[in-house]
């Protein structure tokens, strides 16, 4: 879904032929994992605390990355990848070996020991040069929509204009395209409506997440995915609310933002246009949510990063806080060490200090994704040469 919530690339100087891109920053550094005892101890793969493990989901995510890595697109991407020592062949061999270890290991401890023995840990240098990475979450929302506009369903998602490649730059802003109220743009999108949603904030959030599963009023299910975006930068509406004193940065979560606009709907006209970027969609025929590598993303096993800096499709390890339902139904934060695959990107995911975790589809996934907002660490795992 090329992620747009929290996602595309820092500037690189690209030189073709035998030269690599020139990096203005160093995104990854080799480190020893020994300083953190719990690093690589992924308890979710096996049954834990009475819950079913997700080993098959992890294996499926690995297979999706392998599918990408064998494509011509991956060959091109890795020819230009700037970090010395990280090649497509090494990434493939690393995934093949890790998959074998996941199948042969019988416990988190056994897998952790094998990974520490056989793999090199490349830590993201983070937003401070010392490995501090900011984590957020994203999800595939589910909403009700209509194939035709009605009094109830008024807010459209739009197809990519057929002449989009010929639009003059910079592209029009969100305000120009859809108006302050989301319904009174300059007319250039007229006739490109794909579906209509009931609430304006829902249509906006589909643009933020980059895809959606829609329950149509005629009883059918439609899935939509990213088709393109304007060249305007992403600007966080939540940050705008913080800047204006509407909420505190410490309490900034997606549920809080939704709650604010539900109680003050007149503020939508003021704040949504402050994000000037605009996303277009296509119908995806019921396909699973798909990342920027054109392979499906897997709940809690796929991440989005800046693909100008990080190796696409590669095996990674995150050390971060993720919310889980407690026994009383509330969400509580837990520190986890989780093996993931780097399979997506997004308009606000820039630099070596940002990661977005895909949390799945639907309301619960959205609740959990919206509460991920903390610092952690990101590592890429490559077989020792």
Cite the ranges covered by each PLM segment.
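C-terminal soluble interaction/assembly domains
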Residues: 285-385
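Generic alpha-helix initiation/capping and coil-helix boundary signal
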Residues: 8-11, 58, 335
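Secretory/export targeting leaders with adjacent low-complexity proregions
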Residues: 27-285, 292-295
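Bacterial N-terminal signal peptides
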Residues: 9-21
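Bacterial N-terminal signal peptides that target proteins for export
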Residues: 1-9
């Amino acid at each position: 879904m090329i992620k747009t919530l929290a996602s595309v690339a820092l500037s690189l100087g690209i030189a073709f032929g035998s030269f690599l891109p020139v990096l203005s920053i160093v995104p990854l550094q080799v480190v020893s994992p020994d300083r953190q005892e719990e690093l690589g101890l992924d308890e979710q793969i096996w049954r834990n605390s009475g819950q079913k493990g997700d080993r098959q989901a992890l294996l499926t995510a690995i297979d999706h990355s392998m599918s990408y890595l064998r494509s011509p697109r991956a060959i091109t991407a890795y020819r230009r990848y700037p970090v010395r020592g990280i090649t497509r062949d090494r990434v493939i061999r690393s995934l093949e070996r890790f998959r074998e270890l996941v199948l042969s290991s019988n416990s988190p401890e056994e897998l952790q020991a094998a990974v520490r023995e056989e793999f090199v840990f490349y830590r993201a240098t983070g937003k401070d040069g010392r490995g501090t990475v900011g984590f957020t979450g994203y999800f595939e929302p589910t909403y009700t929509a209509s194939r035709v506009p009605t009094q109830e369903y008024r807010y459209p998602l739009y197809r990519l204009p057929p002449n989009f490649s010929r639009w003059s730059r910079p592209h029009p802003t969100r305000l120009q395209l859809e108006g302050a109220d989301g319904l009174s743009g300059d007319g250039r999108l007229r006739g490109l409506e794909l579906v209509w949603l009931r609430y304006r904030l829902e249509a906006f959030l589909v643009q933020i997440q980059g895809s959606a599963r829609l329950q149509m009023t005629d009883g059918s299910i439609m899935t939509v995915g990213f088709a393109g975006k304007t060249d305007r930068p992403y600007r966080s509406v939540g940050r705008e609310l913080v800047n204006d004193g509407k909420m505190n940065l410490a309490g900034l979560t997606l549920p809080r933002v939704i709650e604010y606009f539900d109680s003050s709907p007149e503020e939508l006209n003021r704040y949504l246009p402050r994000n000037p970027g605009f996303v277009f969609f296509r119908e995806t025929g019921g396909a699973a949510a798909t990342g920027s590598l054109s392979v499906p993303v897997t709940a809690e096993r796929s991440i989005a990063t800046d693909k100008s800096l990080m190796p696409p499709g590669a095996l990674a390890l995150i050390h971060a806080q993720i919310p889980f339902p407690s026994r009383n139904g509330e969400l509580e934060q837990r520190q986890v060490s989780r093996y993931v695959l780097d399979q997506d990107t997004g308009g606000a995911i820039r630099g070596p200090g940002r990661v977005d975790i895909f949390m799945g589809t639907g309301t619960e996934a959205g609740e959990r994704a919206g509460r991920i907002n903390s610092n952690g660490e990101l590592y890429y795992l490559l077989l020792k040469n």
